Amino acid sequence: MRLAHEEKKGRYIALITIFVCLFLVFGIRLINIQVVNGDKYATKVASSYSTSVVKAARGQILDRNGVVLVGNRQGNDIIFDASSFPSFSEQEKRNEIILSLINLFEKKGEAWINELPITLDSSGNYQFIEDREKDITKLKSRDMLHLNKYATADDCMSEIIERYSLADFQKQDILKIASVCINMKSNVFNTANPYIFAQDVSDELVSVIKENSTTYRGVDVQISTYREYVDGTIAPHILGVTGAIDAEEYAVLKEKGYAMDDIVGKSGIEKVFEENLKGKNGVKTVKTNSDGTQETSIDGLKNGDNIVLTIDAKLQKVAQDALKRVCDSIGTANAGGGAVVVMDCNTGEVLALASYPTYDLSTYFEDYASLAKNKNVPLYNRATLSTYAPGSTAKVSTAIACLEEGVADASSTKYCGYDYNFLGHHFVCQINHANRTINVRTALQDSCNSYFYYYGGEMLGIDKMNMYREMLGLGQPTGIEISENTGVLDSPSYRASINQTWMPGFSLQSAIGQAGNLFTPLQLCNYTATIANGGTRYEAHLVKSVLSSDNSVSVLEKQPKVVCNTGFSENNVKTVHQGMRLVVTNGSCQNNFGKLDVAVACKTGTSQVEKNINGSKKVYTNGFNISFAPYDNPELSVAVAIEGARSGSSCAPVGCDIYNYYFGNNTSDDSTDIPEDENEEDIYSEGPVDSNLLF
């Protein structure tokens, strides 16, 4: 018993010792806080801190002369703040706030974000909205309503009504509330990720919401940055648009610090240079002191870089206006649109690039529905994406190839009769220039098919012909930053890849720019620049430099990049130049380029294309014009393509306006006449390939 008593007594002593030690430790700590560092901790307790994200300003986009094409302005966004907005368990309260807010917006005539792909038909039944397949699929997905792919609009709405307690509302109101609730889920609404209910709201509406903050619990205002355009019609296909990040983009970009409410580039330069333009968000810390004063600091904020383009804004406007004027003057029901590209022959810089019809960036979202349905596809960049049979513009490449390979020289001639016989089959040349002997210069001047059938199709052959076309960039990527189409350089291997047979007649057709060759206006311009400068092909580019947000630091300086040194003979290049100059002095472009003060060299072309118009097949003619100037010391190359043009020379007035502006001439636009069809060189001979000629 005594031993047990001693053990119990020892435990008590140990326990008391532990308590004494703990008391001493806490006592010393308390003395340290209250006496030694009392002032420090008193100040800290008396102060409060709050942090928030500061969005980086998106970088500007400028032309080569520093003219701002795309800038920024501030606007009001209405957001739901999850820290004070009713929780999911208070869905009825959520619905009340959402519907009240929607009614307020509709009363004031302002838009809110409504993306639900369901509407009511004329009978008041739910139905999916046409052309919203992607959104409908997402709505049914596992992450959203978790319904099978065959679910109807009624099935979707039944699930939504049950999930979000909407049974007591009218159908129209159900759709409105449902749209917001579905969007909140899609955008992962939580305390770290506010939901944007409406964007760019008026100050008047903001005031109403703030005055009724108790009604609109958790509804707040966020100042955001919006893109601003000096002129939204300038270079829209180059600049591109921005928009709210979608789920697919967020899955990729969240690792780079993007939030679900971020704005990202969707097309053009805005998309390609997203990483530079975006910048980095910062953290704003507000310290409120015991006396009510505040101290604010922002850490980590880096505004987006500025992108300087090679484009000259004034030249771009001239090119756009000229293209529109000529396209509109054609006025044929077959005309779909056109494109023009202007390049610096000696650097690959794109000085202007226009596609018609076009659109206005400043009203892009309001106009999108009508733009998307327009049969002439104004949203499509014809300059870099549309491919065309180049017609006689390709004869320049055939000419240089024949001269370089020695199958012809400057004095080689060919008698041109209207009929050209090859292996018992008959090809034709144009009526205008038949029954004469011509050389390579006059063959280019008159666009003689017979000359190129013989020296290009028969003597040179498709393999050598294409070797030179590849060097000149035809059917090859130009390297431009925005989306482009590579086109088609027709060949036996290409035909095999599409399960077709290369026929002997294709070589002759290819020599004059027909067969299956398809090139973009950008490729035609780059090819012309290569011919103009003597044989150096540069990578085409739209970006001149990237600068820091205050323009003080150069992030990137784009240098001319040589893609191919062709090594063409100077004499052969001179011969081809002379032939192109004759088109202006003695050929089909005397009435336009021939009137300018600057000496221009050019080549025209046409190609006939079958088009389905209102259910019936019709044949219409595309027109092309490639040119460079000045003739003796080339600086610019210009390529014009117009769908439904009467002739290649009818495209020349676009180039005239460009050269007039660039070289400071005073020739009136009205002096550059659009020739009639009979002045064109090859409109009769460049139709769709006849199967009888292919053998």
What are these regions (language model features)?
Residues 321, 325-329, 356-359, 582, ...:
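Conserved helix-loop functional segments at active or binding sites
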Residues 83-86, 642-646:
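A generic structural motif
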Residues 191, 301-303, 558-560:
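Short glycine-enriched loop/turn motifs at secondary-structure junctions
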